[in-house]
Amino acid sequence: MRIQLLRHYFALTLLLITSISSASPFGLSTVAAVVSANTASTASPKTFVFSAIPDQDEANLQERFDKVAVYLQDQLGIEVRYIPVKSYAAAVTAFRNNQVQLAWFGGLSGVQARRLVPGSQAIAQGTEDPFFTSYIIAHSSTGIEPSDSLPAAITGKTFTFGSKGSTSGRLMPEHFIRENLGDTPNNLFSKVGYSGDHSRTIALVQSGAYEVGAVNYKVWDKQLADGKIDSDKVKVIWRTPSYPDYQWTVRGDVNNSWGPDFQARLTEALLSMDDPDLLASFPRSGFIAADNKLYQPILDTAISVGIIDADQ
């Protein structure tokens, strides 16, 4: 269809040049120059768009990732824009529909997105992401103390995960709960909720709305350092074993739109990011190379928990 449209366009262009050049006082060269300029305009690279899973407050993410967009624009020499999404599922959908070409995904959402878009690649991850962990946190009223093993005393309590699509706020905590306590969350807890993001999980447990919850350790540590957590009301009672988590994933067709070396240049720009203010957007100390096979354990776990269908 696109080829046919181009043929019609150039046929009409030739007819226009032929008819106008004989009558126009500006002559053939002027008309040709106008056509050339219009053709160049239509061939200009489109805006490169990226997003990120909404694992924290949306307003903060917008402010921080807008700065990342400026950085990438300077590095790549094209227009770059960040767009927020309302949920983890919305981030995956935007990637699938090519509304965004790059996304800062969690381990699970990245696996889901790459399964939907063949050829897409994990290209960079945070320095901390190969060894990511989750915290199990509890309200002080439970009387549960920190332990090196998952406290069985959480059984029967109300429990909130983060987003249903979160690696650190749902998938891996659920996996370790099943592994350590021998049953599903719905059977173990008196009530199971999904807060939507890590910041809300902390707020819900701190307020006592839920007695226990699972949270991304980076979000907890940052909020604690920022003075947003009341340690008299909520505390970490267990830290999970490590697992691979967040990564930058890019669609496999970006080179078709921005040039044969675009993915390589994009990867280099991400790996070279060293401005502490930009890195605080994630928050990470830096980025290292990543690839799809690093996230096979996440896929395997998602299949075993029942979040991903192995036959899809």
Where are these regions (language model features)?
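Ligand-binding cleft/hinge of the Venus flytrap
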Residues: 66-77, 168-194, 222-230, 304-308
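Periplasmic-binding protein-like
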Residues: 49, 53-54, 128-135, 228-270, ...
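Short helix-initiation/N-cap motifs at beta->coil->alpha
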Residues: 82-93, 106-108, 184-203, 244
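A ligand-binding cleft/hinge motif common to bilobed small-molecule-binding domains
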Residues: 104-117, 178-179, 204-207, 211-231
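Bacterial N-terminal signal peptides
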Residues: 9-22
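Ligand-binding clefts/hinges and TM-proximal coupling segments of bilobed small-molecule sensing domains
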Residues: 26-28, 33, 158-179, 264-312
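A conserved helix-loop-strand patch within extracytoplasmic ligand-binding domains
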Residues: 126-182
